[in-house]
Amino acid sequence: MKILYLLLAVLLTVLQSSLGFMRVPNNEAQCEQAGGICSKDHCFHLHTRAFGHCQRGVPCCRTVYD
């Protein structure tokens, strides 16, 4: 029974590290792949937020409810 707890702990550790695989987008292709839109100056829609950059100073915006 103790081995079951050990296996569960290892499984949770592996899953926790794999959940953080998504990185912040650094270019336009990565932004669109992550479901975002490149905006000119700021995120224009009320329910969007910046979560990366398409270029220098150009935010990648995505809806909050995704």
UniProtKB/Swiss-Prot annotation:
Pro-peptide positions on chain: 20-25
Pfam families membership: Defensin_beta
UniProt keyword Secreted present: yes
The tissues where this chain's protein is expressed are given as:
Expressed in the liver, kidney, gall bladder, testis, ovary and male and femae reproductive tracts. Expressed in the ovarian stroma and the theca and granulosa layers of the ovarian follicle.
Q: Which residues form the signal peptide?
A: 1-19
Q: List the disulfide bonds.
A: 31-60, 38-54, 43-61
**Any one of the GO BP annotations:** cell chemotaxis
- Induction summary: Induced in the theca layer of the F3 stage ovarian follicle by intravenous injection of LPS. Expression in the granulosa layer of the ovarian follicle is not affected by intravenous injection of LPS.
Q: Can you say where in the cell this protein is located? A: Secreted; Cytoplasmic granule
Q: Which InterPro entries match?
A: Defensin_beta-like (IPR001855)
Source organism, top-level taxon: Eukaryota
GO MF term set: CCR6 chemokine receptor binding; chemoattractant activity
GO CC terms, sorted: extracellular space
Q: Name the principal localization, coarsely classed.
A: secreted
Q: Which keywords has UniProt assigned to this entry?
A: Antibiotic, Antimicrobial, Defensin, Disulfide bond, Secreted, Signal
Could you tell me which PANTHER family the record lists for this protein? Answer: BETA-DEFENSIN (PTHR20515), GALLINACIN-1-RELATED (PTHR20515:SF20)
Family of the protein in this entry = Belongs to the beta-defensin family.
Q: What does this protein do?
A: Has bactericidal activity.
What is this protein identified as? Answer: Gallinacin-8
Lineage, highest ranks first = Eukaryota, Metazoa, Chordata, Craniata, Vertebrata
